[in-house]
Amino acid sequence: MLQNTFTWLDEHYDKIAVEEAIQGDPAVPWTILRLPMVYGPGDPLHRFFPLLKRATDGRSSILLSEDLAGWRGPRGYVENVAHAIAVVATSDQAAGRIYNICEEPSLSELAWQSKIAKQMNWHGKFVVLPRGQTPKHLLQPGNAAQHVVASSERIRTELGYEDLVEIEETIRRTIAWEQQNPPSALNPQQFDYGAEDAALANVP
């Protein structure tokens, strides 16, 4: 899905190489911003949609593979990320510095989805399964045992950055946008409830 949306993303994509090239050029004044997974209104990946659809469809249980449930990665709400970029761009102190932009703390995928579900007043339960027992359409590529955890302490302490929108409100706004702007095309295999029910039937 990432490559379908971002066609420039391939196996040669490497941001670190770009950072090193910029830092190695004494003629170029630089500041490096490391951005998170950005969510919110306008998200081309519709990150909230699979959970919202299952809840709306009346699913009482939502499955996560064990490795994905525990995975942690940096997230940021679109307005907060834009504000952080503006703070850096207008600061004389930012030259020659590297800043991570992300929410604090970095929640596990299970904790994150639980916060979204709570905002939706969904009263079902999350069921965490070993990867080998998880339906194939729910498995994510990559190595979920490798967390991607960043700290935004530097931009907060050095430049005084603060989130403009608190996390509960960011989730509420994103849910509202997703409900009003569902994806134009759905992959039915992504919502194979028969396979999910079969996996649930084998849970002790």
Name each region found by the language model.
Residues V18-G42:
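Conserved beta-loop-beta element that borders a ligand/cofactor-binding pocket
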Residues I32, D67, P74-A82, I98, ...:
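Conserved loop-to-helix N-cap of the C-terminal "lid" that shapes the substrate pocket in Rossmann-like
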Residues M1-I16, G24:
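Conserved Rossmann-fold NAD(P)-dependent oxidoreductase catalytic core, especially the SDR/UDP-sugar
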Residues G58, S91-D92, W177-N181:
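Generic structural signal for alpha-helix termini and adjacent loop/cap motifs
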